[in-house]
A protein has these predicted regions:
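Generic structural "secondary-structure junction" signal
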Residues: 6, 12-14, 44, 48, ...
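Compositionally biased, intrinsically disordered low-complexity regions enriched in proline and serine
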Residues: 11-13, 32, 43, 47, ...
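Extracellular receptor-binding modules and their adjoining Ser/Thr/Gly/Asp/Asn-rich linkers
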Residues: 37-88
Length: 165
């Protein structure tokens, strides 16, 4: 297919071409797959409102990728035996990612804190910056060190997307 590109870069057939839905959808799927196939690792900054946590021998694994003006990311924190959890409300700063659109509050869709079979859902909120406070979804109160008794082996994961500027 001879293609033209829109301002966003997505392929579409030239108006002089005979439409071929299967071919055109494959071209679009190939384009999107090439755009999303490689995630970029990053290291978010984990802070708290009173005393900052320290990951110690735990791990923070994070990656992001961008399609058009949407940025997708995932963060997984696994507490180790020397992880300290700080005190106060938690915030993750998405260091190195594209800046969100200013002037609109973007709720990050999903997060979960897991301890064995128990879990707590929470949301994040971006408001024109890369600093993302975390909130427990049931009451929209801050996710904090006091929300649960954190321990070695506990995990919490954040997956989300937002509109970049």
């Amino acid at each position: 297919m001879a293609t033209l590109a829109t301002a966003s870069g997505y392929p579409y057939p030239a108006t002089s071409e005979t439409p071929d839905v299967q071919r055109d959808l494959k071209a679009l799927a190939d384009y999107l797959e090439a755009k999303t196939a490689t995630a970029t690792a990053f290291t978010p900054t984990w802070t708290a409102s009173t005393t900052n946590p320290a990951i110690g021998n735990g791990t923070i694994a994070a990656a992001w990728w961008k399609v058009g003006n949407l940025v997708f990311f995932r963060i997984k924190v696994t507490a180790g035996s020397t992880t300290t959890f700080g005190t106060g409300s938690y915030t993750f700063t998405l260091t190195g990612l594209p800046t969100p659109v200013a002037g609109i509050r973007q709720v990050i869709p999903a997060g979960i804190y897991a301890r064995g079979a128990a879990s707590t859902a929470f949301q994040g909120l971006l408001n024109g910056s890369l600093a993302m406070p975390l909130y427990v979804t049931t009451a929209f109160t801050a996710l904090a060190s006091t929300t649960a008794a954190w321990a070695s082996g506990d995990t919490f994961e954040i997956t989300g997307h937002y509109m970049a500027a």
